[in-house]
Amino acid sequence: MSEIMKIDTVRQYNDYFGVETLHLSVSVIEGCKAKPLRYCRKLYNLYAILLKDTDCGQLKYGQSCYDYRQGTMLFLAPGQIMGSEDDGRLHQPEGWVLAFHPEFLQKTPLARLIKEYSYFSYNANEALHLSEQERKIVLECMEKIRTELQHPIDKHSKSLITDNIKLLLDYCIRFYDLQFITRENVNHDILTRFELSLIHISEPTRRS
């Protein structure tokens, strides 16, 4: 098993991808603008939100494996490990990443609220699969954050950045809820059809 890389700062994360650091505590990375990388497992001491635009196969996330398909999001909290084993090849990153240091949230409402977003926990046990419309909303939120990072820092910067991070997190809660509701409806429909088939099979037996 390959060595685990520790990611302690936003600058270190940007250097890993080969992109410019616009802000010491927050980064939005567009994969196509990053350098080709070898796969590795990483210990995150940051919050990271990953959106993939290509099929990356299985990723190790904690003790679980996830099918990280196109249009999939994963959410990482400080202290969590994620990544794929090095296969010896360089790969061009795809998709988007939002990373932010937990200290950036201090003295903001999001510092208290962040623990309420349960998808940052290993216990969430499921990636978020986006529709095309949901993906568009996520990218709009990331673009807003990136635009603010490119703006000269002033007294409004921190609140605008954290507000837009919260907006993205709130949308993702909605999308997770829709994902679970959709699955429950599908499972209920499958169960109903299965029960009807059992009734259909048993009817000739009762008649005989």
Task: Give the positions of each predicted feature.
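Single conserved hydrophobic/aromatic residue that forms the stacking wall/gate
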Residues: H200-S208
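Histidine-centered metal-chelating micro-motifs
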Residues: L74, G79-E85, L105-Q106
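Short beta-strand His + acidic residue motifs that chelate non-heme Fe in jelly-roll/DSBH
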Residues: Q58-K60, M82-L90
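Generic protein-terminus/edge-of-domain signal
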Residues: M1-D67
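Residues immediately flanking
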Residues: T54, P78-Q80, F100-P102
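A hydrophobic/aromatic-rich effector-binding and dimerization subdomain
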Residues: D87-Q150
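An amphipathic alpha-helical interaction segment
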Residues: Q133-N185, D189-E195
